[in-house]
Amino acid sequence: MGSTDSKLNFRKAVIQLTTKTQPVEATDDAFWDQFWADTATSVQDVFALVPAAEIRAVREESPSNLATLCYKAVEKLVQGAESGCHSEKEKQIVLNCSRLLTRVLPYIFEDPDWRGFFWSTVPGAGRGGQGEEDDEHARPLAESLLLAIADLLFCPDFTVQSHRRSTVDSAEDVHSLDSCEYIWEAGVGFAHSPQPNYIHDMNRMELLKLLLTCFSEAMYLPPAPESGSTNPWVQFFCSTENRHALPLFTSLLNTVCAYDPVGYGIPYNHLLFSDYREPLVEEAAQVLIVTLDHDSASSASPTVDGTTTGTAMDDADPPGPENLFVNYLSRIHREEDFQFILKGIARLLSNPLLQTYLPNSTKKIQFHQELLVLFWKLCDFNKKFLFFVLKSSDVLDILVPILFFLNDARADQSRVGLMHIGVFILLLLSGERNFGVRLNKPYSIRVPMDIPVFTGTHADLLIVVFHKIITSGHQRLQPLFDCLLTIVVNVSPYLKSLSMVTANKLLHLLEAFSTTWFLFSAAQNHHLVFFLLEVFNNIIQYQFDGNSNLVYAIIRKRSIFHQLANLPTDPPTIHKALQRRRRTPEPLSRTGSQEGTSMEGSRPAAPAEPGTLKTSLVATPGIDKLTEKSQVSEDGTLRSLEPEPQQSLEDGSPAKGEPSQAWREQRRPSTSSASGQWSPTPEWVLSWKSKLPLQTIMRLLQVLVPQVEKICIDKGLTDESEILRFLQHGTLVGLLPVPHPILIRKYQANSGTAMWFRTYMWGVIYLRNVDPPVWYDTDVKLFEIQRV
């Protein structure tokens, strides 16, 4: 009954606030206390009892009352942080104010006129803590709020375990408390694992949700093309002003990486006990990736003096960016810390793949997209971590889940962002030689995927999944094709033995991409052929010995290479090819690719359910902007190549078939000549046809085809195994052109990808926060909300 009464009183207070036309004095505590002192309303109650329309009405019609509500709520949080929340009543007030601000903040952010409100000063809230009355020293409301949240996240008996055993009199003084002793979870820089406490976890979660809502002002600003714009909320929270920056960074990172959703491995455990840890871990992951939203391409920012107390951070390194969270992340350097982080992320990413004989017996986590963003940030900001990941075959524990997600999401338009981040991570990894070498490890674990069964290595798995994405994904994935093939090019010089299934897939892609209608239907399509020829050349020149399957497939499909060498360039043939294009709506033919049986236990990739919400994404930069070319020297070191001057599309192809203009998200796979913008000419075809790198393959065919034909005639053979045996023991030493230098296209940070990551990350956070629906139905500007 008490709960119903308090809800009723709370609702009455809301109605009073919305109907009062006169400003209510800030000193009228009897009125304001109705919102937090007497109630025990859950966050769901607050969202139900404070409708969006009423918040907007107060904002428009009695703005001073909304301003006072926010000011008073922040004041209560500051008081709670100052006092240390010793009584249950104080704790309840802090939680109620936190929920109310979480509800109201998005409506402050959506109105440009209100955007500066939290950054205006409140008289008497002095920076020096002396309560100076002069406004010059007054702290903006946003700063007071953020510092109070930080203090409250390390408040003994509220969000952390108290270390004192004695009476209330000697309760820990919140000002002298060293929060590094109260880190939430063992892991990086902290060995002690505190006892799990359900109440503390729930309180942390509420405060983190408010913190995330503070940071979400970014959602209400349109994506700016060269956006170096820093989020003022994140900038202040991650600065030296926040004395809890290090322990909070460590707490968030350790909470995520130490989480084990399977618990003690008891089947159906999650059905018996509600897992209160997962919501906290999700919230921690989301707050962490937002605090790390920092454009590494422009990180030549002023530096801090590196004043950290944690030994886990590398003090030998020069101080990093002003954002302390990025700074701390970039300075983690101990092997055991890297191992803890990598094992934790791999365990969580692999969780949705867990197949057991008992259906639904293990808990499946839902925050894999946040984990992928976190993994990306770790690799991008901490090169030592990237090298650690690639040092052993542990990198494959990250690769397999990513390939699973890519394959699973390929038909679902609402998961285009997931496809992009998975491919971006693999592009980043593929720029390192060790990644290609690691792919030669046999693939034995059988994750049920909707792909043909094969026996081979992790390289086979990668190529088979990429083939599936290209041939049976939806059309919005076409901008990713050159990224996918760049990854294959980067690893190709190191692939020791591809399976027959994989060899056939690569030849099928070449066959599909080299049809005249595909080559002539868009200005960039021929680049895909260049990439595939580069793959074949790398394997023939550097890994011929173990790759008899691929050599045999090339011999069998030799007509494709002859057709490319004799590609017609006359106007009638070009016109005829384009006519055929208009009659062929399929982006790629799947004929000629033997699908074979799919893996046991797999389910086909399904399109999104109609009506599924998705958020729009900004276009990604083209592969030429995403990567820079490096040449591998004889000693294995990389030498960066000067970018060659780009020619315009009219006067020919870019150097070596390199994509010269971004393949934009908006670009449809249909012919662009229909809109009158571009149509292929004989000169254009000749300009790149003359650069097709066919010499190595033609020489191989010239040497091997007569020998293979002779074996077949002499022995009356139709058996592949005999031919493969011959190819395995054959050699082309001295018969092929001099090996070309290995070219690697390494990912390079740029403002375009930084903006893409920002929109993707906030889109994920928007869609994942449905209970309560923090941002739903507010006027966000960073992306559009669409229905599939």
Swiss-Prot record:
User: Lipid (N-myristoyl glycine) attached at which positions?
Assistant: G2
> InterPro entries, alphabetically?
Hid-1/Ecm30
Give the signal peptide as a residue range, or say none if absent: none
Instruction: Return the Polar residues bias intervals.
Output: 590-600, 669-680
**Region feature Disordered, mapped onto this chain:** 297-316, 571-681
Identify one Gene Ontology CC term for this UniProt entry.
Golgi trans cisterna
Post-translational modification Phosphoserine, affected residues: S653, S670
What GO biological process terms are annotated to this protein in UniProt? insulin processing; response to glucose; secretory granule maturation; vacuole fusion, non-autophagic
Keyword Protease: yes or no? no
Query: What outcome is documented for mutating L533P in this protein?
Result: In DEE105; uncertain significance
Q: Which UniProt keywords apply?
A: Cytoplasm, Disease variant, Epilepsy, Golgi apparatus, Intellectual disability, Lipoprotein, Membrane, Myristate, Phosphoprotein
Name of one Pfam family that matches: Hid1
Task: List where in the cell it is found.
Answer: Cytoplasm; Golgi apparatus membrane
Membrane topology qualifier: Lipid-anchor
**Mutating R433W: effect?**
In DEE105; uncertain significance; patient fibroblasts show normal expression and localization
Q: Where, by tissue, is this protein expressed?
A: Expressed in heart, skeletal muscle, colon, spleen, kidney, liver, small intestine and lung. Highest expression is seen in brain and placenta. Loss of expression is seen in some breast, cervical, hepatocellular, lung, thyroid, gastric and renal cell-cancer lines. Highly expressed in secretory cell lines. Expressed in almost all regions of the brain, in cerebellum, anterior frontal cortex, and striatum.
The family note in this entry says:
Belongs to the hid-1 family.
Q: What does this protein do?
A: May play an important role in the development of cancers in a broad range of tissues.
Q: Which disease is it linked to?
A: Developmental and epileptic encephalopathy 105 with hypopituitarism: A form of epileptic encephalopathy, a heterogeneous group of early-onset epilepsies characterized by refractory seizures, neurodevelopmental impairment, and poor prognosis. Development is normal prior to seizure onset, after which cognitive and motor delays become apparent. DEE105 is an autosomal recessive form characterized by onset of seizures in the first weeks or months of life.
Q: What is this protein called?
A: Protein HID1
Q: Which organism is it from?
A: Homo sapiens
Q: Which gene encodes it?
A: HID1
